């Protein structure tokens, strides 16, 4: 199979879809890999690094899409890429369709096979291709939250861990999954007072056992969230419903309950956001203020640490990429039910129910 790795063109997206080590594995199995020139530069990989493992370098993104049977990316295609995607071409990347109707319609029109990293799901309901980026995003959410609590950034001017004799910052984390757990670990390590919420009591019991003692757990309800808001300094939204839009856990009216300079970090923004007042921002303009509350809603948080996140992503995606390349998408998905759940839009049909339901589109079960 011919695999193409284009350069990401989303604002400040510095990751690349495959490391040289991943390319080497595919080449060893007899496949041909084309990489766009400088695609890996911001992740620390030069064109020479790819050439050394027998990748072919192409100058333009158009060339990569034109030649490849399968495209391996990081983020969803954006408008300039829509017309480049070919009928029957496999596109393996994060899509987050439920947050973007135009993207969904464009992929339907393309007749491509769109396999979304974020909905590949194992029998135990774990999300193996979302987990590594969730780990990065959770840790980054705390880092950026701490930065925007600084007064020059519009925050309250609080140090996360305080100092002897001065109370530390209070952090509320909505969602106790991979993102929330990693955010809590980082915040606790910085010395903050941390409260993490979830609706799953079994998960809360687990978190109580494994997280540091300065992390408390709370059942997630509207009442409980409202009770916490007047005293928090940083809120991290990390709620996930696989493949579906995130619920709004904090409304605009609830912003009035918080003190000016409180920071909201919406990690769920790529699934529509879990704050009513959230809209996507970029690394170049990451924040905005609504009713005195600082909002950070960058949709590609891990793109700020591309070396770490690219390595982690390829570690997770490579076995699936190899299976798709060696077997073809139909056989690979037939052999692996987890991978089959990644099929979101296939040859003009919406094949993931949550996406179809969000947009009122027809859902068609895929036959393998």
Question: What does each model-found stretch correspond to?
Answer:
Residues 118-144, 148-159, 269, 274-368:
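Adenosine-phosphate binding glycine-rich loop
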Residues 2-110:
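An N-terminal-biased, well-structured beta-alpha scaffold segment characteristic
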Residues 69, 75-76, 95-96, 221, ...:
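Short glycine-/small-residue-rich Rossmann-like dinucleotide-binding loops
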Residues 2, 8, 77-169, 298-300:
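Glycine/serine-rich phosphate-binding loop and adjoining beta1-alpha1 elements at the start
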Residues 209-291:
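Rossmann-like adenosine-cofactor binding region
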Residues 6-7, 11-45, 152-240, 287:
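Glycine-rich phosphate/diphosphate-binding loop of Rossmann-like nucleotide-binding domains
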């Amino acid at each position: 199979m011919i695999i193409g790795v284009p350069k990401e063109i989303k604002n400040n997206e510095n990751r690349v879809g495959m490391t040289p080590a991943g390319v080497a594995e595919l080449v060893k199995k007899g496949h041909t890999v084309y990489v766009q020139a400088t695609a890996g530069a911001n992740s620390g990989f030069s064109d020479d690094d790819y050439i050394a493992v027998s990748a072919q370098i192409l100058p333009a993104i158009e060339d990569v899409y034109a030649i490849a049977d399968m495209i391996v990316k990081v983020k969803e295609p954006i408008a300039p890429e829509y017309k480049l995607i070919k009928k029957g071409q496999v596109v393996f990347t994060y899509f987050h369709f439920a947050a973007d109707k135009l993207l969904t319609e464009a992929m339907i029109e393309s007749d491509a096979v769109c396999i979304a990293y974020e909905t590949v799901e194992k029998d135990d309901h774990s999300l193996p291709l979302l987990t590594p980026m969730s780990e990065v995003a959770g840790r980054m959410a705390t880092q950026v939250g701490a930065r925007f609590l600084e007064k020059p950034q519009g925050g309250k001017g609080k140090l996360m861990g305080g100092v002897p004799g001065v109370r530390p910052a209070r952090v509320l984390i909505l969602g106790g999954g991979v993102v929330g757990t990693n955010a809590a670990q980082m915040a606790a390590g910085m010395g903050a007072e941390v409260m993490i919420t979830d609706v799953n009591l079994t998960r809360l019991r687990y978190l109580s056992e494994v997280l540091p003692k300065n992390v408390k757990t709370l059942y997630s309800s509207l009442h409980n969230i409202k009770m916490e808001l007047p005293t928090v300094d940083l809120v991290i939204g990390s709620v996930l419903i696989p493949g579906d839009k995130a619920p709004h856990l904090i409304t605009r009216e609830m912003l009035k309950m918080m003190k000016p300079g409180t920071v909201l970090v919406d990690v769920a923004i790529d699934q529509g956001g879990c704050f009513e007042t959230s809209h996507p921002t970029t690394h170049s303009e990451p924040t905005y203020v609504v009713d005195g509350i600082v909002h950070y809603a960058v949709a590609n948080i891990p793109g700020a640490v591309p070396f770490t996140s690219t390595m982690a992503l390829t570690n997770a995606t490579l076995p699936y990429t190899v299976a798709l390349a060696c077997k073809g998408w139909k056989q690979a998905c037939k052999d692996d039910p987890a991978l089959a759940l990644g099929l979101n839009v296939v040859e003009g049909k919406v094949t993931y129910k949550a996406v179809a339901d969000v947009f009122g589109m027809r859902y068609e079960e895929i036959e393998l």
